[in-house]
């Protein structure tokens, strides 16, 4: 497919999803054009047969068209322009669509809730990847060249410069999340950012670091700004809901002056009294659960084995708050490399299919076109073009990923837990320099590389033995 998404392809997709009048929203994640639809019965599932489309995921209120990294963003931008040129609907059409949209909301609340995470975190992912890569490369250079932490000179200065982006991102990350979350839940982004900033401020006048808020209690009640990302998400949701209620009763002439003011006062009160303690408990519980799963080899195997299924259903973005919680509690994201084993298992399965296929078959061409992205951590071309349509190889790919997750879990159980140095990043081989551990970057890279190798080999063996029987290898 050409680098640019053709207008003919987008017009065809628009027609097959029911036309502009059936589109409720248009957005994208890293690899998918996400179209919210009013009536899923109008969607033609044969969109997946269009040239340039790598796959399609259908839910009761959303169509996810898989294009691949970079292309999804361009497709969403071009589709938004097409929708902006669409003719205006009449009142009857709008009423009918609102009715269908309400029905969809009533029947797909869980998926809609998980889809919010894509809206909140997808715009941040390029920054996570860039900051994580810079930090990983700087750490690797410092380790290999034995640069002390307090060294002076051009090289240490350059390494510190490369690391500063990660420090800046994670110091003020909650403000970015608060802004995006408030918008995703229907509120004003800056209100969410201001509320999120309350979680960053310090409430101990004797502290020598941080930014003192100017008071240490809330009308005599202690302040415990815990919970971080979990608390910020809850607070941003509450902020958006409160803003909507205030706006309903606010006269138009006073809206700009008073709506945000009242919203902030009410939300901040709830944050200090309820949300911060609640977010802290949820944060501790979530961290405890996944830290114990990560140190349990069987738990790691289950997580890695099921992750491809989460990708197929489009709910894998729901793990991002967990990644952020683990960053806060451990200092690295120990879950991400475990889940990355799913993609490695699929690479092994694809190589087995290539080996078993006929020399000039279409299957070999499909694998050749998708294997390099798979090695680099982009799994959708392999999922939708190679393994999932044949089902058995998809299952054996999941088993290969589970084996890789088991390997990483065993190493952690034996005393070497490791993880990603960022909340989110690339997977596959590209993620190697982003690995870190308490023992340093090189042991972490070795464990991750070992997990990938185990997943490749097991995915290949499982598919060769069980994934090719009664499967179309043409």
Swiss-Prot record:
An example Gene Ontology molecular-function term: protein-N(PI)-phosphohistidine-sugar phosphotransferase activity
Active site: 29 (phosphocysteine intermediate)
Membrane topology according to the record: Multi-pass membrane protein
CDD domains: PTS_IIB_glc (cd00212)
Stretches of the chain found on the membrane's Periplasmic side: 145-157, 202-217, 282-301, 356-368, 415-440
Top-level taxon: Bacteria
Gene Ontology CC annotation, any one: plasma membrane
Protein name as catalogued: PTS system N-acetylmuramic acid-specific EIIBC component
Organism: Escherichia coli O157:H7
